[in-house]
Every structure is written in C-alpha cells, then in structure tokens.
C-alpha cells in the first residue's frame, strides 16, 4: 500500500509533467528524483492551487434564474463564498417568489406562504432560523383558536363531536392508518389517492362512533370540511394526490407556527442585503437557456454568442454562464421546458416534470370600514352551504357545477387586524374561483356570512385582495404535490444536475427538495444545496 502523503505527492507530480508507472514507482533512483522534486514543488503547487481557486471565484460566471427563496438563497451562498460573478435574473418586477406580502387595510396580508413551522421533519426550519436571528423584527406564535362550526341549515354542531373528529383527522394526516396497512401487508392500491384514503378510513370511524343516522351525516360533513382544509394547503383536488404525499411529506402545519405581523417578506432583507442591484435584476423574463455546446464534446470553442453557454432574456440581453441554476416554478417548467432549454432536457427529467403535480392555493382577503368584532365573535367554519336559486354557480366546460362558497373552509379575522377577514377555500375549482369577477365574489361571500351569522346587517366589504398564481405567466400555479402518477423518485430526478464534467445546469426550488417538499424551507435549502454543489466542484478541482 502506498503511503497517503506519497500518493498525494505522486498525484501532484503527475500533473507537473511526470509520468509515473507502477514499475518505476519502486525504482530507487526514481524515488530520489521524486523526493527532491516534491520538496521544491509542493509550496509552488499550493500557491498555484490557491491562485486557481481565487481565479475561479472571481471569473466563474454563474446565472441564477428566478429570485424566489431558492434563487436568492443560492446567490447569497455563492457570494458568501467569494463567487463574485453571480447574477440573478427575475422575470417579474419583484423578488421573493411565493413570499408575497401586501399592505391591505390595517395590516399585512400574505398572498403566498404565511406560516413558518419551527421544524421540518424533525430538523430546524431554515426560514425560522432566519427570522429568529433577524434583529428588531417582531415575530409572534399563532395562538390556538377553536373555530365555530356553523351549519347553514340551522343544525346544532356539538363541540365534543368536532373535537373528536379533529383529533381523528390529524391522525389520518400523519399517515397513522397507512402505516398500519403497510405493517400488516395491506394493499395500498385500493386507496389509490389521498381522497380515497380519507374517505375509506373516515367512513370506518363514522360508522363505529355514530350509529344515529343524523349524527353520522353531520360527522361526514365535519370530515368533509377537514378534507377541504387539507386540500386548501396544496391547492388541488385530493383525488389527484398520491398517497405517498401523506407518508413522505407531511402537509399539516404545526399547531403554533410562527408568523410576522409586518409581512413574511421581511425575511428577504436578510437574503438580499449583500446582493447588489447589478447582481439582482428584475423584469428579466428568460426566453432561452443554452446549457450545453459543441465545445462540451471536444469541439473548439466558438466566438459566436449563440454557440456559447448562456441565458437569453426576452429583451434581447445575453448572459454568458459557466453554471446555470434554474429555479423556475414547476408550473413554468411544465408549460415551457420543451422550448426553453437548448439542447432539450433528458427524457427522464422531462418525465419527472410532467409527473409531479402543481396546485393553486387561493388566498382571499376582505377589508371592512369598521371593526369586524362588532358582528364576528369567532372564526367560522360553514357546513351545509346550499346553492340559492338566484345565485350563479361556477361554470366548468360550459356546465354549471356549484356555488363557489361551498368550497369555503374557514372565515377568520387576521390576528394582527381589526378590519380584515381571510377566506380560506378548499376542495377544488381553484382556478375558476381565482377568475371569478370581484363583484360576484363579494356578493356571494357576504350572503354566506349573513346566512351563517343569522344577521342581514353584516356589511359589504370595502376592498378585496386575492392571489392570482394560476393566471400569472411567471408562476402558472402555486405549490407542487405528489400526483397519482408521481413519486419521490421524480423529485430526485428533477433535482439531478446536468453536465458531463462540471455541473452546468442545476435545478433548485421547492419541487426539488424531498425534505421540506413544497415549502419555503425546501425552496431555501435547495438553493443552498445547488450553490454548494458548484463550490465543491471548484474546491475539488484545485486538487485534480
């Protein structure tokens, strides 16, 4: 066995012009020559290696596409490690991605991510750590609030029934029954999707706990409300969600997550404080990503811009790149990956993009002129909302389906406000609800409030604020999920970098992180992961 120090010396010499073979390694004269050369060249090699690393840090051109949490975290990490030629291109006129706080009424509202869990899969949440270390920023823990279930048909909803069903549902969300099926060798294929799982298991619980037909019907309605709550987080019908999402990526938020009364976008200040305006450019939608050229296969490097690795924006500007970190939302990749990348992405990666689901959580806020507490004493969860004969329904493919207010999960007063209500919707029809005219939406939610509160004097809102993730060309949706055609393997395939020797095209974003999949923590850690991949490449390269 060759001594490690001698082995390193041999490797250094082989790159200095010496060609050692197994035969002359054990030749005494050769070893004497080698020994003298090592002493003279080791310090020179160290200096040369250090110079090469510093040169790489100064000259390596890195383009980050997208200034959401993944892109900003990647850029921050690269700049901290000295890679000064890093630039971030953002298509919209703002940075932050799904972190989007708006001043509305007397408070700040979140059109994207809202709550920050302290832990993700048992580990500290990196966004929580950022907020915790932000000096002078007011943070609060969400207080546990018991929503008041109100049946629009006047039926009484017993609190003890709500408490029991809520506890049972939390167990289902943690995959409690799925785990039992796996341990017992049960057939998971009969469940097929999350809704099938929820319905199958909840029916067993309802049948066992409530023999009375009326109570059984009410219990089903409460369960249905909780199903819609789960659906509202992902922004899709649960029939589309793979059962693996329950077992691999817990969706339910903690009982007391953290929130920022002055807007979660304060976290962006920490990420951008050392990124200059030249390095963070907004209003730069990307039209083409040339991630591989003929020179990668041994051909001479071409002076023509279109034959170099580069990112081309729709305004005509070109950015040369040694490495490209793509943090485009999954919705954009689904619609444009076939035309964005040159050459085309490998079939395996395109298949992963197609397989993964992308939901559209809808956020709706209403502002009132006078304090809400005059007529709303607690958060409301409506049950049994019916379609009135004079009220328009949601139209899907030319058919009238149902009133959108039947999708309302909860109506709640924002904890930092006296004048703003949040309307939480779930179950489906997210894209259709997002496109409803303002007047229709305001009239129907006011009618629902008056019905639930038995109060025809509930005022009309003064203003409306809502999200538009599915109709924004730069997002085309809001959150990834495991569809029934996808699995954790698709997340791994999407995250794999491309490039024969160097990692040329890298992928980050909440859809590329198994740990924290679909969360802002997953977005941040994925950006750091890909930045570190580039850093590691150059640190290792200096010894090659």
From Swiss-Prot:
The keyword Disulfide bond does not apply. Its main location: cytoplasm. GO terms for molecular function: polyamine oxidase activity. InterPro entries: Amino_oxidase (IPR002937), FAD/NAD-bd_sf (IPR036188), Flavin_monoamine_oxidase (IPR050281). Gene3D superfamilies: 3.90.660.10, FAD/NAD(P)-binding domain. Keywords: Cytoplasm. One of its GO terms (cellular component) is cytoplasm. It is found in: Cytoplasm. It comes from the Eukaryota. Pfam families: Amino_oxidase (PF01593). Has a non-vital function. This is Protein anon-37Cs. It comes from Drosophila lebanonensis (Fruit fly).
């Amino acid at each position: 066995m060759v001594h490690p120090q001698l082995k390193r010396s041999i490797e250094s010499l082989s790159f200095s012009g010496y060609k050692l073979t197994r035969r002359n390694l054990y030749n005494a004269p050769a070893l004497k020559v080698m020994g003298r050369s090592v002493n003279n060249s080791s310090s020179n090699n160290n200096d040369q290696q250090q110079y090469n690393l510093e040169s790489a840090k100064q000259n390596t051109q890195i383009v980050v596409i997208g200034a959401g949490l993944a892109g900003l975290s990647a850029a921050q990490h690269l700049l901290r490690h000295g890679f000064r030629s890093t630039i971030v291109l953002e298509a919209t006129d703002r940075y932050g991605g799904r972190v989007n706080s708006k001043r509305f009424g007397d408070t700040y509202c979140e059109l994207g991510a809202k709550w920050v869990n302290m832990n993700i899969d048992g580990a500290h949440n990196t966004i929580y750590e950022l907020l915790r270390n932000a000096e002078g920023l007011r943070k609060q823990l969400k207080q546990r609030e018991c929503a008041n279930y109100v049946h629009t048909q006047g039926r009484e909803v017993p609190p003890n029934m709500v408490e029991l069903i809520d506890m049972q549902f939390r167990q289902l969300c943690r995959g409690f029954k799925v785990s039992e099926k796996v341990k017992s060798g049960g057939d998971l294929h009969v469940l097929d999707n999350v809704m099938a799982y929820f319905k199958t298991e909840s029916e067993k619980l309802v049948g066992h706990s409530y023999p009375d037909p009326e109570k059984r019907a009410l219990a089903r309605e409460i369960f249905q409300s909780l199903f819609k709550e789960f659906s509202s987080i992902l922004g899709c019908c649960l029939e589309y969600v793979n059962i693996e999402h329950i077992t691999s990526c817990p969706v339910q938020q903690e009982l007391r997550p953290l929130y920022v009364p002055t807007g979660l976008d304060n976290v962006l200040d920490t990420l951008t404080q050392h990124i200059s305006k030249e390095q963070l450019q907004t209003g730069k939608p990307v039209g083409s990503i040339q991630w591989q050229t003929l020179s990668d296969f041994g051909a001479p490097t071409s002076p023509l811009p279109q034959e170099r690795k580069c990112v081309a924006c729709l305004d005509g500007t070109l950015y040369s790149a040694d490495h490209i970190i793509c943090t485009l939302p999954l919705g954009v990749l689904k619609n444009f990956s076939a035309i964005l990348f040159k050459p085309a992405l490998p079939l395996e990666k395109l298949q992963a993009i197609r397989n993964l689901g992308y939901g559209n959580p809808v956020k709706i806020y209403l502002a009132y002129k006078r304090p809400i507490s005059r007529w709303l004493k607690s958060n409301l969860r409506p049950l049994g909302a019916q379609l009135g004969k004079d009220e328009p329904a949601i139209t899907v493919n030319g058919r009238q389906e149902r009133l959108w207010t039947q999708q309302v999960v909860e109506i709640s007063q924002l904890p930092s406000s006296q004048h703003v209500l949040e309307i939480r919707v779930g179950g489906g029809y997210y894209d259709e609800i997002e496109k409803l005219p303002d007047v229709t939406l305001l009239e129907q939610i006011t009618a629902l409030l008056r019905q639930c509160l038995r109060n025809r004097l509930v005022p009309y809102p003064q203003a409306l604020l809502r999200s538009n993730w599915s109709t924004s060309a730069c997002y085309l949706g809001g959150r990834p999920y495991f569809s029934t055609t996808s699995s954790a393997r698709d997340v791994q395939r999407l995250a794999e970098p491309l490039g024969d020797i160097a990692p040329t095209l890298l992928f980050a974003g909440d859809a590329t992180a198994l740990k924290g999949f679909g969360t802002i923590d997953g977005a941040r850690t994925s950006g750091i992961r890909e930045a570190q991949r580039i850093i590691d490449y150059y640190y290792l390269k200096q010894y090659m």
